[in-house]
Amino acid sequence: MTSLKLLKEKAPLVICITNDVVKNFTANGLVALGASPAMSEFPADLEDLLKYAGGLLINIGTLTDENWKLYQAALKIAEKYNVPAVLDPVACGAGEYRKKVADDLINNYKLAAIRGNAGEIASLVGIDVASKGVDSAGVDNIDEIALAANEKFNIPIVVTGEVDAIAVNGEVVTIHNGSAMMPKVIGTGCLLGAVVASFIGLEKGQELKSLETAMLVYNIAGEMAEKRPNGHLPGTFKVEFINALYEITDEDVKEFKRVK
């Protein structure tokens, strides 16, 4: 089974093409976890780096026409070297341009997983869910949204919210761990996309277990951070979350996981 120990042993190089707001937080989070991040954004450099990579994250948060071309180039190179790519279609339900870019990347390039909140994933499959920018309202049918997207795209899907859902090959599991402090720190969702990219390629054919482990590690680390002194304050939580990602073990995951 995919484990945190395996990630630390392999220390996969993860290329993160992510939004400008969260680059530092993302890099520090991956280092704490045990992965090796690179924030490269130039196609010639990506050609050199991706041949050694264990994962690629495409996060469309700070979207421009130039970045769209960069995403396309990176995904072409990743497919060339069989590097699993994860798409985070940030705010794709908030406007036509973002939806157009997300649709292009999903329909024309090879993806190993898509990670988004309920509003984002629902917009990709035409389900009506209230969404405001990068945030979405709580929904009761998050597992149905995950399954609908998995069926439509035949790609593993992670839908995040108060409850998280993972759908792979028509099978769905829900994760009931996490911290209410996470939405109060900008970048926690974006870092999660990078964590998913770190785990997804560890074991071929074990995508469901890999995604489940990624989500549990991340969410339980959030619970650990919130319980620490002043962890209920967003500034302290941000620091303690990085610390928790560094300290969490497979034993913690086994003890505290809540999966249905």
Curated annotation (Swiss-Prot):
The keyword Transcription regulation does not apply. It comes from the Bacteria. Disulfide bonds: none annotated. InterPro entries: Hyethyz_kinase, Ribokinase-like. Its EC number is 2.7.1.50. ATP binds at R115, T160. Its cofactor is Mg(2+). It catalyses: 5-(2-hydroxyethyl)-4-methylthiazole + ATP = 4-methyl-5-(2-phosphooxyethyl)-thiazole + ADP + H(+). Pfam families: HK (PF02110). Substrate binds at M39, G187. The keyword rRNA-binding does not apply. It is an enzyme of class 2 (transferase). Pathway: Cofactor biosynthesis; thiamine diphosphate biosynthesis; 4-methyl-5-(2-phosphoethyl)-thiazole from 5-(2-hydroxyethyl)-4-methylthiazole: step 1/1. GO terms for molecular function: ATP binding; hydroxyethylthiazole kinase activity; magnesium ion binding. Keywords: ATP-binding, Kinase, Magnesium, Metal-binding, Nucleotide-binding, Thiamine biosynthesis, Transferase. GO terms for biological process: thiamine biosynthetic process; thiamine diphosphate biosynthetic process. HAMAP family: Thz_kinase. NCBIfam families: PRK09355.1, thiM. Catalyzes the phosphorylation of the hydroxyl group of 4-methyl-5-beta-hydroxyethylthiazole (THZ). Belongs to the Thz kinase family. This is Hydroxyethylthiazole kinase 1. The lineage of its organism: Bacteria, Bacillati, Bacillota, Bacilli, Lactobacillales.
